[in-house]
């Protein structure tokens, strides 16, 4: 029906969040009273109270919050050292991919940080890794060096650029894609299942997927599908 992205503001009040959400819903042709149910998955504890209060006040529904008391249905390999402590967004991604594509698969979520998660053919979470996101690398260069400029996040035409901007883009973007390809290859080797699918999601998924042959599926709405699946299971 529609989706929108907002930057996180941990100091936003429930009124600010509620008014903003109502305005975005109206842009898609819906009124607040059209909303009959809500589910929230957050990895920013500071905003949970404000978001929950906003949903109750402006939409009149009690949201289901995906937390430790909500069974996502994801199984964990016993070797995982923090079973059940996987970030909400990552667990939700895995549930969605299991339902939509089946295991085995790797999920790469390209956000502020990049996360890679592996799930077996039997639907068991095997582990993952968290490299820094490409935007973090570019911002770090800008903040920690006096003369290097902040640059746009685009793929350059060459590794050997003749400008400072192009060289930063080559190092950050092309270097990042190379690192992602390395992680995919080695994760597949560790899983040992040749038919492992690679699913990309998150804001930068298209940039990476368009420049590598190792990603099978780009699914920008994966986490939203996962939240829907969890809600439907919880309400059965």
Regions found by a protein language model. Give the residues of each.
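Conserved phosphate-binding/catalytic loops in two-lobed NTP-binding clefts
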Residues: 60-74, 213-229
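N-terminal glycine/serine-rich phosphate-binding loop of ATP-dependent small-molecule kinases
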Residues: 1-72
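Glycine-rich phosphate-binding loops at beta-strand->alpha-helix junctions
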Residues: 41-48, 195-215
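Glycine-rich phosphate-binding/hydrolytic loop that grips phosphoryl groups
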Residues: 91, 146, 173, 206, ...
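Short glycine-aspartate micro-motif
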Residues: 39, 105-109, 199
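Short glycine-rich, Thr/Ser-proximal phosphate-binding strand/loop in the N-terminal lobe
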Residues: 1-28, 123-149, 154-158, 166
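Adenine-nucleotide phosphate-binding core of ATP-dependent small-molecule kinases
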Residues: 4, 8-10, 156-197, 215-217
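Phosphate-binding/catalytic loop of phosphoryl-transfer enzymes
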Residues: 53, 61-65, 70-144, 173-186
